[in-house]
């Protein structure tokens, strides 16, 4: 009986800790959204709400952010600089920032490209130049392959474009797992200290220094919301297979 009792105690404690973590995660998420509310506007694409910022006049440029980020990465300085000569639009990708998720299975780069392409049409943008950073460049590449008639040029910065050797980090493996992720993500969202998030942001720029004010602008707490953690992990988990499938079609690219 004693082993059964101990097992019951452990299960009860685990369930209580998991429930408490969900409550605390909700509080932290509301605080993050209050501190970093939507900075742009929304466009409806079918049943999906897409968050975007537009600034400037001239030929259209679309900016797509990378993993663990949102459009604030682009509005820190790049949007203002490009807006001197272009009409610049930056989007939140699905599940990141304030754009809705398309579904719970992890949006592919092609699905994300289709959503953002439809959003540009809804906004009246004309054959934009696409600039994607890191993972966002993979989305831009999928966009140019799938919808070449909607793109005038393609700019990829540090973006995965071909299959690579190597696996995922342990964190991505856990968070993308249907069971382990459901257990781990509430604890991460509830208890990961802000100092850890700050340190991760700083390491992105190694060996250079982080630009002054960048961490205060981008809204890093938005990235540890439960929906963002799950979406981010699923996006990363599927990327290699999606790039491998896309690569044979690069000879069809018709943009510069």
Regions found by a protein language model. Give the residues of each.
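Conserved HGGG/HGGXW glycine-rich cap/lid loop of the alpha/beta-hydrolase fold
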Residues: 48, 54-98
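Alpha/beta-hydrolase fold catalytic core
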Residues: 1-60, 84-86, 125-126
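A catalytic-pocket lid/entrance helix-loop region that shapes and gates access to the active site
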Residues: 157-160, 164-191
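Conserved alpha/beta-hydrolase catalytic His-Asp/Glu region
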Residues: 31, 168-169, 189-252
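Active-site loop/oxyanion-hole signature of alpha/beta-hydrolase fold enzymes
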Residues: 45-47, 53-55, 90-131, 135, ...
């Amino acid at each position: 009986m004693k082993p059964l009792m101990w097992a019951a105690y452990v299960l009860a404690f685990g369930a209580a800790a998991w429930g408490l973590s969900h409550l605390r995660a909700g509080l932290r998420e509301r605080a993050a959204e209050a501190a970093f509310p939507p900075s742009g506007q929304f466009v409806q694409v079918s049943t999906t709400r897409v968050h975007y910022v537009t600034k400037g006049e001239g030929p259209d440029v679309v900016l797509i952010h990378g993993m663990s980020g949102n459009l604030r990465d682009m509005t820190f300085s790049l949007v203002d600089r490009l807006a001197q000569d272009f009409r610049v639009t930056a989007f939140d990708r699905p599940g990141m920032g304030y754009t809705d998720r398309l579904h719970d299975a992890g949006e592919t780069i092609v699905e994300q490209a289709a959503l953002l392409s439809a959003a540009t049409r809804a906004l009246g943008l004309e054959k934009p130049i696409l600039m994607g950073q890191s993972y966002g460049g993979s989305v831009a590449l999928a966009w140019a392959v799938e919808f070449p008639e909607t793109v005038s040029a393609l700019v990829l910065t540090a973006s995965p474009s071909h299959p690579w050797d190597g696996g995922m980090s342990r964190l991505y493996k856990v968070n993308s797992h249907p069971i382990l992720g459901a257990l781990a993500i509430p604890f991460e969202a509830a208890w990961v200290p802000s100092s850890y998030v700050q340190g991760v942001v700083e390491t992105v720029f190694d060996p250079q220094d982080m630009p002054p004010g960048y961490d205060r602008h981008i809204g890093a707490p938005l990235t540890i919301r439960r929906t963002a953690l799950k979406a981010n992990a699923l996006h990363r988990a599927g990327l290699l297979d999606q790039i491998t499938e896309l690569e044979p079609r690069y000879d069809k690219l018709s943009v510069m």
